[in-house]
Swiss-Prot record:
GO terms for cellular component: cytoplasm; ribosome. This is Ribosome maturation factor RimM. The keyword Chaperone applies. The PRC barrel domain binds ribosomal protein uS19. It comes from Prochlorococcus marinus (strain MIT 9515). Keywords: Chaperone, Cytoplasm, Ribosome biogenesis, rRNA processing.
Amino acid sequence: MINHDEWLIVGLITSPQGINGKIKVKSLSDFEERFTKPGIRWIQKETESPKKLQLISGFQKPGKESFVITFKEIKNRNEAEKLKGYKLLVKVDEIPKLNKNEFHLTELMNLKVKILENNKLKIIGKVVNLENEKNNLLVIKLLTNDKEVLVPFVKEIIPEIDIKNKFLIITPPPGLLEL
């Protein structure tokens, strides 16, 4: 299990790329250098301890939020295939400092989702995932029916985020939560 007090998930290893051990990573970060600048990186499968690897190189796929990276220790496609599903991590103490009211997307995970109903805030679900290949979308699991809905991550729909108190408020347009 990932200790979110120590680690921040910045990418998801999705597949091998080619036959020479290159790996495709879906980015959950705004900091491109995490995938392109050589140095130590950490990967983890959900139930294992983080493993240290040496990033040699990486580049962003044109028009995508994914990168192709090369680790020194991964020599071929078979080794790369074994890393599918691993998370790319950074230590929390190595996270760049953000300005006030800024946060890392992964900090939205497990936040309670509230909606204003009859002038009172009501919890309707929680953030269970992020979809960000083309647009940033929050996957929200509703309490009423366990259904998952996609909510665009835009200020008009999500006007308030309170990381410290672990909730966000949404103002969905009619029908969004019924899709």
